[in-house]
Amino acid sequence: MAKDTTGRLHVTVKSAGRLKHSSKLWLERQLDDPYVQQAKRDGLRSRAAYKIIEIDDKYRFLKPGISVVDLGAAPGGWSQIAAKRVGSAEGRGQVIAIDLLEMPNIPGVTFAQMNFLDDNAPARLFEMMGGKADVVLSDMAANTTGHRKTDQLRIVGLVEDAAAFAADVLRPGGTFVAKVFQSGADATLMTQLKRDFATVKHVKPASSRKDSSERYVLAMGFRGAAGGADEPPV
């Protein structure tokens, strides 16, 4: 599950003669990207952190004291922002970061190395949190094949899985934010979200690259699952 990072660039464009053309373009873009450089200065693990900052600055769902789940969290940029805004490092809220990959510790963030698609994942999360979540975040992107139609289906499928997980673990009134890509393949996803949430919209933060079809779906006001608000999902 691909995510952008701001790790040190060990090669320069000039010395990258052995790289493929696509890799050179990526490297040039990283070196020229002001958000990559700003993330390093701000001590953030990825430029993606600015995306959730922008979205939350406008819609204000990361409130002090709430419970947040970050799916596909590595390298941890979104978790860093969530922890700061809910106050989990000071014990005022909690952030659970979930990923298949290992992730270095972040103050105020509890890391769970697991697959959120496992049947017992919602119950495990519920046990860790002692209740359901107020916000579920997902900046995940499916691994691509280069075949446009196949990739679109994979991307939408991953978001649908994240949305289903959110429906299992969110409290009524909760919020779901997930990365999607502009295409005609997400109609079913949007229909499902509009059924489960009071407000659903697409947002594209300024820090999302202009030449990218990337955008985010923001679903607020979860209508609630069949069970009680704080009973373990089954």
Label the predicted regions.
Residues 2-67:
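Class I SAM-dependent methyltransferase Rossmann-like catalytic core
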Residues 57-63, 129-130, 168-169:
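Glycine-rich helix-loop-beta junction characteristic of Rossmann-like nucleotide cofactor-binding loops
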Residues 72-76, 181:
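Class I SAM-dependent methyltransferase "Motif I" SAM/SAH-binding loop
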Residues 75-90:
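Conserved SAM-binding loop of SAM-dependent methyltransferases across substrates and taxa
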Residues 89-92, 170-175:
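Short glycine-dipeptide loop
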Residues 92, 98-145:
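S-adenosyl-L-methionine
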Residues 156-172:
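A short glycine-rich, Lys/Arg-flanked "PGG" loop and its adjoining helix->strand segment in the class I
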Residues 182-234:
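Class I S-adenosyl-L-methionine
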